[in-house]
Amino acid sequence: MKKIVTEYRVPYADTDQMGVVYYGNYMALFERARNELMRACGYTYKECEAEGFMLPVVHAEADYKSPAKYDDLLEISAWVQLVKGVRLEVACEVRRKGEDAVLVKGFTRHVFVSTKDFRPCPPPQRFLDIFKD
């Protein structure tokens, strides 16, 4: 399974009064990594929508191990951990660049839905060919 790593420098706006990255901002980092994963695999979200389906998030989880701070250079890894029926799960891990310790790990669960009626639909074969083990 393809795994990508994308970098992100923490701006001051992402931190809270405690001086650490606000917990909710990690979901935005997960989304950035998901988009880069799709792009690296040659199947962008824009193409998904043009082909008649979308992938809304229906569940998200994150385990916070250690905080990131202003100006940290982060590496966000992402990979598909499950494609089953109409479900897709993308796992993510966040580390400081050059360090092994995981700061945050988690995943997002998505459901394939039609752009016409937002009802669940099977994933296209092209998607399965790219992302399924």
Task: Please name every model-derived segment.
Residues 2-59, 113-133:
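Hot-dog-fold acyl-thioester-processing enzymes
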Residues 37-88, 104-106:
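Hydrophobic beta-strand-centered segment that forms part of the acyl-chain substrate-binding groove
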Residues 2-6, 69-73, 81-133:
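HotDog/MaoC-like acyl-thioester-processing domains
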Residues 11, 65, 96:
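Residue-level recognition of the GNAT/N-acetyltransferase active site
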Residues 15-17, 64, 101:
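Short linear motifs in intrinsically disordered/low-complexity regions
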